Amino acid sequence: MIYEKVAEELISSSYTIAFTGAGISTASGIPDFRGPQGLWKKYSPELASIEYFEKDPKNFWGFYSLRMRGLFEAQPNKAHYSLAELEKMGIIKVIITQNIDGLHQKAGSKNVIELHGTMRRSYCVLCLRTYDSLNVLSMIEKGNLPPRCDCGGIIRPDVVLFGEPVKNIYEALSIAYESDLVISIGSSLTVYPANLIPQTVKERGGKLIILNMEETPLDSIADYVVREPVEISLPKILENVRQKILS
């Protein structure tokens, strides 16, 4: 059975990392981006670009505040909790995520690298003062659009917008360079340069496990591919790991 084999790989690995995408959070009510019901089927990606923020911050925040509210209301699902437990057991060393929802930390994960930033924090573009994004939402709900800092600068979410470089990519790639196993969870593996992380592990002689409902460009080089919702597959993997450790 594939879950037993994946569990064996995780246990025998000396340095496993998890690479997560939007698909791990869909069961939490957060739409992915490129799937059949994805966010970019309903909205133009331009709305989440640095160019649009600079050109029209008022309407940028009109879109982003709606998305932000949905992320704050979301709760971790079984996939997040299973990953946090695997980290607690020492199986997963680092979680590298493309997500900005903060659900890994909410589920109890400690060692998380956020490639695209976090929706939970915002900052002033002039003085760089940081804000809890919940407080920024309160400003917007009181009619302050776009939200402004005390210094007069416009506040923006601390996320990577289209047209901006990815955060922490070199740190993430250095970790991938040392890893002998990467488990990719809920990622389309189409977004560059983030998709270099699983590729780097494979190129260094490591193994790649893909958990994703849709096909990915890296399926052909993966050691295992599991086509099942990740909120189902990850708890099964966790249970198999527990059984093998206890036996």
From Swiss-Prot:
A Gene Ontology cellular-component term: cytoplasm
Domain of life: Archaea
UniProt cofactor(s): Zn(2+)
Residues involved in Zn(2+) binding: 124, 127, 149, 151
Family: Belongs to the sirtuin family. Class U subfamily.
Documented EC number(s): 2.3.1.286
Main location class: cytoplasm
Active site: 116
UniProt catalytic activity: N(6)-acetyl-L-lysyl-[protein] + NAD(+) + H2O = 2''-O-acetyl-ADP-D-ribose + nicotinamide + L-lysyl-[protein]
Pfam families registered for this protein in UniProt: SIR2
Name listed for the protein in its UniProt record: NAD-dependent protein deacetylase
Start and end residues of each Deacetylase sirtuin-type domain: 1-244
